[in-house]
């Protein structure tokens, strides 16, 4: 029964971690509205609203490429595609709608009142001739996750990236079958209508989509060297992979639910001098060393000694954590 209880708690924790990722909306794109060509400021990226005179700036990107070629710039510096973004909506209003539908206690979730910022609901990537690229349509995970809660009228929903990928694929397939091109800002409405139909959204107000400004669409030029997608998460893939496979892994369950156990004795090894001395005793050191002209640092050596010693170590080592460049791979080689 205890194992079942821990497994259930573990699943809740994974769902919470996923929601943390989903509830981090991508930054609203910063556009380069003018770009320097010599001493001139040339119109470049563009917003679109009901009063706009700007068209989709594909010609501007091509013209600037020609200018760069004349300056003998490398191909990597040339613009070869653009992202068109739909909407400029208030995060606060959207999350408030979710809280209302889920009947959340607003005193308990008072931080919702402090929310600010804006988000877009999807992007569509096109080449400089208006043809939709392989990247195509990408629905915002933040928009999708909050919408799922609004539709379910509850926060206990299992949101999977696979569902978002499937939605993107279905929308892209419809666009492909109908040979849809994005030659003007208003063509994005075709994409929006397909997505709203798929998600069964009858109106923006129904789901709490309220404009943060009069901007309806935005277009940002991309160079060959630029990141393809705006919707990236470093952790989501890993969390979902672990969530699918954790049930038969006792160490993983124990690690994930460790904070639920009471009366834990934690040792902060970097400040506990007695513990440092204990693990730096002569008999704790390995008999050999990985060939290298470098020696491990103090904390690396302590970690190595702990890892190779079965004495006075009650728990199995589960993971090696740390920011990039802190010596994790070196540490594992030494162990």
Give each language-model segment a name.
Residues 320:
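Hydrophobic anchor at the beta1->P-loop junction of P-loop NTPases
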Residues 331:
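Hydrophobic positions on the alpha1 helix immediately C-terminal to the Walker A/P-loop
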Residues 328:
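Conserved lysine of the Walker
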Residues 292-312, 316:
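N-terminal pre-P-loop "Q-motif" helix
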Residues 1-285:
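N-terminal accessory nucleic-acid engagement/regulatory domains that precede
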């Amino acid at each position: 029964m205890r194992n079942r209880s821990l497994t259930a708690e573990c699943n809740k924790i994974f769902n919470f971690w996923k929601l943390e990722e989903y509830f981090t909306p991508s930054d609203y794109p910063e556009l380069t509205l003018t770009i320097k060509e010599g001493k001139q400021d040339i119109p470049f990226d563009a917003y679109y609203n009901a009063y706009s005179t700007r068209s989709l700036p594909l010609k501007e990107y091509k013209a600037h490429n020609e200018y760069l070629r004349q300056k003998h710039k490398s191909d990597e510096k040339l613009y070869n595609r653009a992202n068109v973004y739909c909407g400029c909506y208030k995060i606060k209003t959207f999350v408030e709608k979710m809280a209302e539908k889920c009947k959340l206690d607003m005193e308990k979730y008072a931080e919702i009142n402090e929310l600010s910022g804006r988000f877009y609901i999807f992007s569509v990537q096109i080449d400089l001739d208006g043809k939709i690229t392989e990247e195509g349509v990408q629905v915002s995970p933040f928009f999708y996750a909050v919408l799922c809660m609004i539709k379910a009228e509850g926060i206990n929903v299992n949101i999977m990236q696979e569902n978002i990928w499937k939605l993107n694929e279905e929308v892209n397939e419809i666009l492909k079958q109908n040979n849809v091109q994005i030659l003007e800002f208003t063509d994005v409405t075709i994409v929006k209508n397909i997505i709203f139909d798929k998600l069964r959204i009858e109106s923006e107000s129904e789901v709490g989509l309220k404009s943060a400004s009069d901007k309806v669409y935005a277009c940002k030029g991309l160079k060959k060297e630029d990141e393809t997608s705006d919707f990236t998460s470093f952790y989501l893939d890993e969390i979902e992979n672990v969530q699918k496979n954790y049930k038969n892994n006792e160490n993983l369950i124990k690690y994930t639910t460790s904070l639920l156990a009471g009366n834990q004795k934690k040792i902060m090894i970097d400040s506990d001098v007695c513990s440092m001395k204990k693990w730096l005793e002569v008999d704790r050191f390995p008999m050999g060393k990985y060939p290298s002209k470098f020696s491990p640092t103090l904390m690396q050596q302590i970690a190595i000694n702990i890892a190779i010693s079965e004495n006075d170590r009650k728990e199995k080592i589960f993971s090696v954590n740390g920011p990039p460049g802190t010596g994790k791979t070196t540490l594992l080689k030494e162990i």
